[in-house]
Design a protein with these regions (language model features):
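Cytoplasmic-side transmembrane-helix entry/capping segments in multi-pass membrane proteins
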Residues: 41-49, 72-77, 97-109, 131-134
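Juxtamembrane loop-transmembrane helix junctions in multi-pass integral membrane proteins
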Residues: 5-12, 16, 94-100
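Ordered, amphipathic secondary-structure segments that act as subunit-interaction surfaces
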Residues: 80-120
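Helix-coil boundary and interhelical linker segments in multi-pass alpha-helical membrane proteins
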Residues: 1-13, 60-70, 116-130
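C-terminal ends of transmembrane helices
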Residues: 26-37, 59-60, 85-99, 144-149
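Short, structured motif recognition centered on aromatic/hydrophobic residues
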Residues: 45-49, 56-62, 133, 137, ...
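The first (N-terminal) embedded transmembrane alpha-helix
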Residues: 15-28, 41, 46-49
Length: 149
């Protein structure tokens, strides 16, 4: 497989990476916000920071406008629906908000955001080292924001 073929196949998978990573990090933000006993607005803010923070910083550093979540505003509705559904589920099921519950969505989001962020930087004609760094920034910055709040 040539590098252009590999890049093309990654481009086709990009929306799937973004979808799975965004949902996974939104869930990690939801769980962290619930562990801190934040109200509904706080839950949405923390979930949004986790889901969109790394990609937003990546877009700023790569000078991409509009930001991915502005360009695809459906993600905001997905985030709101996910927050409402998760809050209802956690309340009805008395879901245990353990550290272990945070590990799965966090790990999935890290891997997928790193792959997706790297691919976006490569598509923007960035050198390989810069692309890898953009992948790391995309993967970790949302979690950093989630943990700070």
């Amino acid at each position: 497989m040539t590098s252009s073929t590999a890049l093309a196949s990654l481009s086709l998978a990009q929306p799937l990476f973004e979808a799975a990573a965004t949902v996974a990090f939104a869930l990690s933000g939801l769980i962290e916000a619930a562990r801190k006993r934040l109200d509904a607005i706080g839950v949405v803010v923390v979930a949004g920071l986790a889901a969109f923070g790394g990609g937003t910083l990546r877009d700023i550093l790569l000078d991409r406008r509009p930001f991915f979540w502005v360009q695809h505003a459906t993600w905001l509705w997905v985030l709101l629906a996910l927050c409402v559904a998760a809050m209802l589920f956690m309340r009805a099921r008395h879901f245990a908000l353990t550290e272990r519950a945070m590990q799965w969505p966090d790990a999935v989001g890290l891997g997928l955001f790193c792959a997706g962020g790297t691919q976006i930087a490569l598509a923007a004609q960035m050198p390989a080292l810069v692309a890898v760094l953009m992948g790391v920034v995309t993967a970790v910055f949302g979690g950093v924001l989630r943990d700070i709040v």
